[in-house]
A protein has these predicted regions:
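Non-transmembrane "mature" sequence context
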Residues: 1-98
């Protein structure tokens, strides 16, 4: 469950950069940290909403018409997109049509 290595590379930090920073014992940048926290927040909220990590993972990767055919995980790359995903998950949690 959770983000794959490829998704971390795509959405947070490229693997080569991550390895280079680890070798030099350097932290993530503020932007990288923000992206990592944002994606962890959405992952956690989806798991809480669906009460099932596998359902949450499938939903996060599902292309949704409501998002113009994009997957929630893709939309959540920005803070504004994350707020949209949080709103949709809130509607799902409260039983409204998402």
């Amino acid at each position: 469950a959770g983000l794959s290595e490829q998704e971390i590379e795509r959405f947070v930090i490229p693997q080569r950069t991550r390895r280079h920073r680890a070798e030099k014992n350097e932290p993530l940048t503020v932007e990288e940290s923000d992206r990592a926290v944002r994606l962890a927040r959405i992952q956690s909220l989806a798991e809480e909403t669906f009460d099932d990590p596998e359902k949450a993972n499938r939903w996060l990767r599902m292309e949704l018409a409501e998002l113009g055919g994009e997957a929630p995980l893709t939309v959540a790359q920005t803070e504004a997109g994350t707020r949209v995903i949080e709103t949709i998950l809130g509607k799902i949690a409260w039983g409204a049509a998402a």
